[in-house]
Amino acid sequence: MDKFIKGMDVSSLPEEAALGARFYDEGKEGDALEILKKYGANSLRIRLWNDPYSEDGKPYSAGTNDFTKLVALASAGKKLGYNYLLDLHYSDFWADPGKQFPPKEWAYADADTLEKNVYDYTKDVLLKLKRLDLLPEMVQVGNEITNGLMWPHGKWDNVDNIARFISAGIRAVREVSPDSRVMLHLDCGGNNARCREWFDAYVQRGEDFDVIG
């Protein structure tokens, strides 16, 4: 992945297609990934939510990005020559600076257990992808983690836990897929002071990473 990355998040594409979305190039209907490839796209971002369904099995929508959809998108992309970034939210739905809720299954876990869960889950996902020959070129450990992840244990006022949780994910990536680059992803790229504060705090405590997103 040394070439310039030109990509997009296509996580909602299968759900959009199922709801009737159609894609066109100069008036001719075509496959969205093929159209994007034609115009120079070379990388896909695909998010993964732990369990994006309610207790009675209803999908949360907005992509309902479970493992099955990840495999379908990654497979379609690989066939067309795309690289892809795996975006691990460690949540059942959108994780962002305003909400970083752990998965339902982890809701009552303490910090030690959460650290183990992150490692085990990340490792399990990557091992499954490895068996399918679908390992990603890059793994994003957490999504928009400016204010931490898996609240309340991983809120910004507990940087030690944030570093523990992220590092657990990184260790799993390095173990299973050492050729995958590791990205840490904030939402405040235009705020130099906040980014410096965050990364200064993290690098004193956490595992090494490769890319800032």
Predicted features along the sequence, with ranges:
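N-terminal substrate-binding region of glycoside hydrolase catalytic domains
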Residues: 1-78, 83, 91-115, 213
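Active-site-proximal beta-strand/loop segments in catalytic clefts of secreted hydrolases
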Residues: 10-13, 47-49, 87-89, 141-145, ...
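Active-site cleft segment of glycoside hydrolase catalytic domains centered on the general acid/base Glu
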Residues: 65-71, 95-209
